[in-house]
UniProtKB/Swiss-Prot annotation:
Binding locations of ATP: 183-184, 265, 287, 296
Family statement drawn from the similarity comment of this UniProt entry: Belongs to the ThiI family.
EC number: 2.8.1.4
Protein name in the entry: tRNA sulfurtransferase
Gene name of this polypeptide: thiI
Length: 482
């Protein structure tokens, strides 16, 4: 099988040296992602496209899907590469390839040509289009808005019969820009802002401020791992977890109620800046949007920025919530975010929307900054690839089974879309559907006399959720890995 990768248009308008660097990085990223599917595949870069050739036909759909999620790719063409002799030969090959698709349809032919030939692209379009129209009686030529567009590419003595076109996510290849550190909470905003910086070519590391115990961290790990696995797995990134409960306790005890929200955010920026400096990261990323909550007014954002020299990027600053939720839905983080608790918003009963610098600084003089230094020093830093393995160690008390007994029921915790695409059927046992994002509220409604075997395709989510349910006091859960 063969895929032709078309570059994001902004890459093609760069200077020659920059364009070549971007293409080289994108080629490496594609190799890093696809080697998990087929170690024998070849990735070859050219001036205006990248060619991917693989032998394992069983991995066709997986490879195609992975390519659509790699930043820097505008679209992917799945092609059949064949030699040709003349225009009539092109027509005959196109007829074999497209006859079934064109039955009863309107169509047009579009050709791109490179190399020296005694015909033009338009000549091929007319010849092939006329031939298809004559040989497929139910098909009809329509040059404007046809039902089917026959795409052909001619390069020297090779013909590319385009079997399908699939849109990529665009953007710049990860690694073409410098690293950033995303302050991730697991909600709608931080997930989308992290994705947007990945799409813009940054390697995104994650910094999580834990305000809600182990269950909160488990949920945020899921989001970070999902984002990395889906859009950024070409690179190694860090997941840094900071236990911020001591900081919150100090704020609640010593800081005036109205100033708590801004001061908490200032403490987070201070801590994240220390982490960024430690690892040589150039900027912080937040999901803040102007006016969305009290700490996100211009006055308060300016005061928050003042505590650090580190650049703070806010890609969602002008977005409204509906737009952000729609983006979360598109990238697949909506279900995570809907069940993620938001702790920052409840720290103050009457937060100020226009904090005064002198008052903020006066309140912060009451704060014991050794507490902040200590939590940063004790921050837990892991390679995000190890999250799955770390989860295995943490849930060692949760039994993993590959079979089942008479009192067992399999609980399919995949999202609804995944379940509809690939329904789970196991002979000899009941399978119940309950998406992972409903477990926290709906698992208690299930028959607790049964033993529930949590299942997901890769096993990461089922292990994380098993740990969460154990912490909630449910001991009748196991992880099912046949």
């Amino acid at each position: 099988m063969k895929f032709i990768i078309k570059l994001f248009p902004e890459i093609t308008i760069k200077s020659q040296s920059v364009r070549l660097r971007f293409i080289k990085i994108l080629t490496g990223n594609i190799r890093n992602v696809l080697k998990h599917y087929d170690e024998t595949l070849a990735v070859v870069r050219h001036w205006d496209n990248i060619e991917v050739r693989a032998k394992d036909e069983n991995q066709r759909l997986a490879i195609r899907d992975a390519l659509t999620r790699i930043p820097g790719i505008h679209h992917i063409l799945e092609v059949e590469d064949v030699p040709f002799t003349d225009m009539h030969d092109i027509f005959e090959k196109a007829l074999v390839q497209y006859r079934d698709q064109l039955e009863g349809k309107t169509f047009c032919v579009r050709v791109k040509r490179r190399g020296k030939h005694d015909f033009s692209s338009i000549d091929v379009e007319r010849y092939v289009g006329g031939g298809l129209n004559q040989h497929i009686e139910s098909a009809r030529v329509k040059l404007t808005n046809p039902e089917v567009t026959v795409h052909l590419e001619v390069e020297d003595d090779r013909l590319l019969l385009i079997k399908g076109r699939y849109e990529g996510i665009g953007g710049f290849p990860i690694g073409t820009q410098e690293d950033v550190l995303s302050l991730i909470s697991g909600g709608f905003d931080s997930g989308v802002s992290s994705y947007m910086l990945m799409r813009r070519g940054c390697r995104v590391h994650y910094c999580f401020f834990n305000l809600g115990g182990a269950a909160h961290e488990i949920g945020v790990r899921q989001v970070a791992h999902y984002l990395w696995n889906r859009f950024g797995s070409s690179h190694r990134v860090r997941f840094v977890a900071i236990n911020f409960e001591p900081v919150v306790g100090e704020i609640l005890e010593k800081i005036d109620d109205g100033q708590m929200g801004v001061i908490l955010k200032r403490m987070m920026v201070r801590a994240a800046s220390k982490v960024a400096e430690r690892y040589g990261v150039q900027a912080l990323v937040t999901g803040e949007a102007l006016g969305q909550v009290s700490s996100q007014t211009l006055t308060n954002l300016r005061l928050i920025d003042n505590v650090s020299d580190t650049l703070i990027l806010r890609p969602l600053i002008s977005y409204d919530k509906e737009h952000i939720i729609n983006l979360a839905r598109q990238i697949g983080t909506e279900d995570f975010a809907r069940t993620m608790p938001e702790y920052c918003g409840v720290i103050s009963k009457s937060p100020t929307v226009k904090a005064v610098k002198s008052k903020i600084e006066a309140e912060e003089e009451k704060f014991d900054f050794s507490i902040l230094d200590k939590v940063v020093e004790e921050a837990n830093n892991v390679d995000i690839r190890e999250i799955a393995q770390q989860t295995e160690q943490e849930v060692v008390e949760v039994e993993t089974v590959n079979g089942f007994g008479p009192n067992d029921v399999i609980l399919d915790i995949r999202s609804i879309d995944e379940q509809e695409d690939k329904p789970l059927k196991v002979e000899g046992i009941d399978v119940v559907s309950l998406p992972f994002y409903k477990l926290s509220t709906k698992f208690g409604d299930l028959d607790q006399s049964k033993t529930w075997l949590l299942w997901c395709e890769r096993g990461v989510m089922s292990r994380l959720q098993a740990l969460y349910l154990r912490e909630q006091g449910f001991n009748n859960v196991k992880v099912y890995r046949p």
